Amino acid sequence: MAVISMKQLLEAGVHFGHQTRRWNPKMDRYIFTERNGIYIIDLQKTVKKVETAYNFVRDLAADGGKILFVGTKKQAQDSVRDEAIRCGMYYINQRWLGGTLTNFETIQKRITRLKNLEKMQEDGTFDVLPKKEVILLKKEMDRLEKFLGGIKDMNGVPDALFVIDPRKERIAIAEAHKLNIPIVAIVDTNCDPDEIDYVIPGNDDAIRAVKLLTGKMADAVIEATAGESEEEVDVEEETTTA
């Protein structure tokens, strides 16, 4: 059975590209036609590309690989957070902090600070500190959580990125290239597909389109890791019976 159907893609509006005046000629191979000044994406190609990306993500996750979901534009923020959490992966949905990949040690220091602040809140340290100081510490904690909450359990650079809108996330793309981290991305008609290892041609502006495609990548992870959980249960059962 296909990973995704043409009907699902049509209903979510995945086929709507950008206005014809805002396009990247390299996307020509993924464009079906032009209608009312808007490019229509060839969904037959999208179906195949989703399948290729799905298989890559599933195989990577099955090998224990970690995927970082990235989408900071408004239309992507909720889907990126929800789907990454659903499949047990990491996400950045606010602002990409420069050096998140290329200077991960510094980012880890900020994450350690966030975890220390959370511990202080949990163990009652905040209760014995002056009110003014607590207000400042909570403000700092909230800010760190906002930008780093989705990667606070990520112990090293990820094995792949899943990106919504490579133009918007160009710093993330550049950092991934520097470290040879493969990139899966929803690529609209105004983007450069040559920058992406696994191109998913589609609308990166419609919430439903973004949710559908992001959800499929999360499904790929779940398919891989659900197998692992079953294996763990089997091993436990064997040990108990033995």
Swiss-Prot record:
InterPro entries: Ribosomal_uS2 (IPR001865), Ribosomal_uS2_bac/mit/plastid (IPR005706), Ribosomal_uS2_CS (IPR018130), Ribosomal_uS2_flav_dom_sf (IPR023591). One of its GO terms (biological process) is translation. Keywords: Ribonucleoprotein, Ribosomal protein. It comes from the Bacteria. Belongs to the universal ribosomal protein uS2 family. This is Small ribosomal subunit protein uS2. GO terms for molecular function: structural constituent of ribosome. One of its GO terms (cellular component) is cytosolic small ribosomal subunit.
